[in-house]
Amino acid sequence: MKNHKFHASLLLAATLLGTSGLMASCNDDETSNTHKVPQAKVLRTAVASGVYTTTQGLSIDMFGLSAKLGQQENQKIEVKALTDSTISLHFPAYDVPLVGDFPYSNAAQKEYQLDKVVVQPDGTMSFASKVKIETVFQMTPAKMKKDDIPYRTFPDTPISCEGTIKGKEINVKITAQPGKMPFPVTYNYAGKK
């Protein structure tokens, strides 16, 4: 009888040991490195991503001089990180009443985007780009109503873009010369995220 009690105790101990070993091995499987979800790589340009509220100044450059034409508040520029060294810049439409002695009373442009703008992430993210894109402009002559003037599409408008993003601040200068316009139009944006 003692022998049966001894064997029963031995069987119970072996069962408990096996069960705890099984639980321990299941627990190891759940936390092993083979089951971890890989972390996504964070792009160096990701810190610049976001929406910046800016003031847009509009001017025209001619004969080495710059003449201010107008400005618009609360222009939202959206910046998206594309790669470690490129971003996209999305510019909203604008509609600016012009000031000064100029033969036009209003300037407007539909929204547009610049893709693959190369960035130099060096503490201050500096960027520059020269492209040709389709732009849609409206220039209202001084003696006409804005609603009577259609927008015109210019398929290969040369655009020059340069600027910086530092911390939560952005500064962008865009120069565009649509169609047969004799002088380039310059937009200066300054704002914060």
Predicted segments, located by residue:
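Bacterial Sec-dependent N-terminal signal peptides
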Residues: 2-6, 18-51, 176-193
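Hydrophobic lipid-interacting interfaces of membrane-associated proteins
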Residues: 57-59, 92-98, 134, 177-182
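Predominantly extracellular/secreted and cell-surface proteins with exposed
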Residues: 68-156
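Extracytoplasmic electrostatic interaction patches
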Residues: 131, 135-193
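Hydrophobic helical h-region of N-terminal Sec-dependent signal peptides
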Residues: 11-17
